[in-house]
Amino acid sequence: TDKDLVLLTELPELKDIVLSGRDITDKGMEHVAQVPKLRRLNLTNTSVTADGLARLQSADGLVSLTLFGSAVSDDRIRYLNKLPNLQYLQLVRTAATSAGLKHLADLTELRGLDIFVAASIGGDGIQHLANLENLARLQLSNTSVSDDGLVHLRGLTRLRALFLSGTDVSDSGLEHVAALSKLTH
């Protein structure tokens, strides 16, 4: 529960935290943000809202964040751009939409982005990822991305892995990313 999370601040070498359950709320994020060496955080099926994500902005060392089945929508995603050192982000079974992806555009250190099981994410949202030049891994599985959305990925020259299972991308859509010479997956 939230009150138990205060104990995490007493673990000076703690780097990875996985929290799940609806009894984890915004209040608990106050304590999580105070873990001095926090690097990776996984929030699965929690009740954390925009206020809780806003509290994480003081977690300077946070490089990896997973939001799985959490109450994450576009208004909550806007706080992610306050995490300038974030390198890996997973948005799984969230309420995020294409419009919400604009809040990721400033995450220039992002190297991996996994968005899956998100029917409200389509090609129009992919345009917001076009300037994430350090992106090496992008997963858009089980989204509404189609051929037209892939045109926005042309400038991601460091992209090595692109996962598109469960999308409406066809062979002709893949022509948009054919010039990405570092793609291996």
Model regions and ranges:
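Concave beta-strand-loop units of leucine-rich repeat
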Residues: T1-H185
